[in-house]
Amino acid sequence: MTSLRFVLTPACLAVGLCIASLGAQAQTTKAPKVQLWMDVSTGTMAGMPEMDSLPGGGGMLGGLMGGVGGGAQGRAGGGNTSYGHARAMSIMPPRVIDIALHNTLRPGVEASQAIPPGMRMGESLPLIPPRAQPTQTEPGEVPQEYQQHQPKGRILLYWGCGASVRAGQPRVIDLARAKPTDYAQAFAGRAVPDRGPRVGPAYALYPNERNQVSLSRDSSLVGEHQVRGDGVPASMKFTLGAAQDLMPAIDLRTTGKPQDSMGTSWQPVRNARAYYLHAMSQSGDDLIMWSSAETPDTGMGLFDYLSPATIDRWLKERVLLQPETTQCAIPQGIFAGGGRDATPMLRMMAYGGESHIVHPPRPADPKAAWEPEWAVRVRVKSHTMAMLGEEMQGRRGGMGAAPPAASGGAYSSGMGGAPTGQQPAGDGGAESGNAGNVVNPVNLLRGILGR
């Protein structure tokens, strides 16, 4: 078997940047002839059973927390029917894989990826060139259609784990007095440049029109993979290990009412390098945001894959929580003003690793030319969402529902199911009970921005 070498590059944003940086060492380098990108994501809704889709495309949950962009970035549910769901906060299906192949030898030609039996998706996945699509909005970016209208209301930013609001908070952004560039920047906040492929007709993608098979609960990417196709080097075989495998679902539990200091706790997530929590709600025309970071930020740009270098830097700056962290308190009363019509929504990220595989490996001799035949990048993450406060306690019917909460409210991810001998509470589905009162950030942004 051809000898392969894992090249883990925490300081590089992508294989292309890594190769370019080697130029400073006077080594002649060329970009890989064939590049493969694999994004893997696990997503759940705390207290809800896992579902691949809901009737009618997911209804309210189909657009919940999907971001303000279009395309796959703007959909949080409804099935893994097209490329791009891994970067979004997809919860239906709960496990998503996006694959993009760029073959400079034969651009836009169909290919296939042989996969290990443990993926439980068949022997191989077809990689198909996409149809032309409008340019998608980047995470945190306010669409142009919303920027044409003068916004109203304010953004109130709170930050940090703790039972009480800290001195100097909240930071207030008055949208009615801000320039369009100011409020666009306010929504974007801290973010990283898009490091994904700019897919188009020259690429071949999965999922696609021919195949939308999703990863199952017991799927595993561990094992040998091989890309085949016209112009693809016969040597394009690589082995993925535990570090590149699907991350577990986040087992999140929340307690307390909006007028209280609400608690969040979770079990450690395997292969998680850092965590980040973000909650938001509405009070009149005001948008209230809180994050677990030690610095103020809207947090709209952090719900994406992060490079190892970015994770390390933001851990040092205390933007992200350390991987050994298992709990975080939300300050008392910051979401109390919304009342029954605005149940706060919490999002949580567990950032996994990023691996680069390049063949052949870089020569030890710095004077020798390096001409990689192919390169692979694999990124993994896990995320979950929860409705905060007692209004939604015990209202999740079906498998994995949380038991009735004691006074003060408690909310579990339901990953372990109801306790032995206790029936799951609630008789409603995903769109029953008070689900209609949950804050939908897409609609909330439309209201603030005058749409």
Predicted regions and their residues:
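Bacterial N-terminal signal peptides
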Residues: 9-21
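Sec/Tat signal peptide C-region and signal peptidase I cleavage site
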Residues: 22-26
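Solvent-exposed N-terminal domain segments of exported/luminal and surface proteins
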Residues: 28-209
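Short, aromatic- and glycine-rich surface loops/edge beta-strands on solvent-exposed regions
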Residues: 201, 211-236, 340-355
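Conserved aromatic anchor
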Residues: 262-271
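Hydrophilic extracytoplasmic domains
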Residues: 270-274, 283-451
